[in-house]
C-alpha cells in the first residue's frame, strides 16, 4: 500500500516539501503531511565499518606516533574513518603479559592519535614473520617449548614461526587474545578485527602444521578463539585462503558470524572466483577491501608492472582499478594505508578519494516521510518513511555481533528541546538498504501520555544497545540537528 501511496505523493509533491493535505486528500491521512528530505553530500560522514582507512602496516618497524600523525593529520581529519593496526604479535606482547596497550608508550600515542581525530580502531595481529623485519611471535613462546620453523624475513633473515597446531603456541595465543578482547571488545572505539591471521602476512596462506590433517581443526580453533572472546565487534577473515571458501563459510561465516576481507583489490590476485564470492555475499556480510599494491607512489617503485591481468602503466592506473573493484563488488572499505600510499592517493587521484568519501560503504538517509502535524492527546497516528542508501556497500546491521542493533526511530521534542518520547520501527531493517535502493515502511505510534502542546518531530537511526541513542549519522541537508537527531517537522497535540 505504502509503495503506491508514496509513488502518488512523490508525483504530486515533486519539488515541494512540507506539503499539507485535507482529510484523505492524495491518500495522506487528515492532519498529516508529506515531507521531502534532501541528502547532505557536502563531505565526510563517518559511520561504523565503512570508508577510508589509515594504516600502520608494520612489516618493518612500527610507526613513530608523533611522526605518523604529523604526516597523516590532514588525511585523518578530511578523508578517513578508521585506523588499522597490522602489527606483529611480538610487538603487542614482547614479554608474556606485557601488553602494548599498557606498557608501550609509542603504541598508546598511536592509538590516542587516532581517537583524538575521530577515527575508530581496527586490528590484525599476526604471528608469522614472513617478509618481516623481525620475528612475528614473541620469543617467550619458543622459550616455553613451542615447535616451529623458519621463514624468510627482510635482509635474508631467518625468522622463527610456530606451527599453527602446536599446543604451546595455541595456549599462549589464547591467553593473549583473551587479554586483547578485554581491552578492545568495545564498539565505541573499535570497528572490526581480523579474526583469522595465520600464515604469511596474516592472510591464511603458506600455513605449516605439525600434523597436516589438522588444517580444518586448527582453523576452527583459531576462529572459535576470537569469536568466544569478541562478542561486540565484527570479526572478518581473508577469504578464499588456502583452506577454501567452503570451509571458511561453514565454520567462520555461518557458525560464528564472520565477515570477509580481501587484500588483493586492483590486481590479478583479485580473481574471478573472488568476484563471484563478493557478488554472492553482498548484503549478507561486511566486506573489507584493501589494495594489493603498496609501498610506493612514484616510478621509483612499481611492483604492479608484473601484473599478468592488467597492463598498469602508473600508480594512477592501479588506483583506478582498485577503486573500480571496491565500487563494483560493494566493499565497505578501502585503504589510504600508510604515509606513502596516502601521499599517492591524495596526490595522484584526489577525485577518487573524494568519491569514496561520498559513496564508499553506506550513506543512508530518509528520502520522504509522511507524518502528522497535529493530533489529539492519546491518539494513535501513523508514520510512513522511505530510506535510501547512496553508498556502494551496505550497513552490516545483520552481522552476528551487531545483532540488528541499529533501527530507524522518530521522536518528539518539546519546546525546551527536551526529548519527550521516541518510537523505533522494528520492521525497518537497515541491512536491507542495498546500494541505491529505496525501502518503504509504515508504522503506528501512540501519543498516549504526551501532554498537549507544541513539539518537533525528529528522526535518527538509534543504537538499541545504547539506550536508543542515535548511532548512525544520516546526513540530511538544511535541517537542525541535536545529539544525533535531525528535526524535520513541527507537531501540535491538542
Question: Where on the chain are the PLM-derived regions?
Answer:
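Catalytic cores of secreted or luminal carbohydrate-active enzymes
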Residues: 316-371
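Active-site groove signature of glycoside hydrolases
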Residues: 148-212
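Catalytic-core regions of glycoside hydrolase
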Residues: 28-68, 79, 115, 192-202, ...
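Conserved, mostly hydrophobic/aromatic
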Residues: 83, 180, 193, 226, ...
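Extracellular/luminal regions of secreted and cell-surface proteins that mediate adhesion/ECM remodeling
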Residues: 358-494
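Aromatic-lined substrate-binding rim segments of carbohydrate-active enzymes
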Residues: 72-152, 215-233
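Bacterial Sec-dependent N-terminal signal peptides
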Residues: 10-35
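Sec-dependent signal peptide recognition
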Residues: 1-7
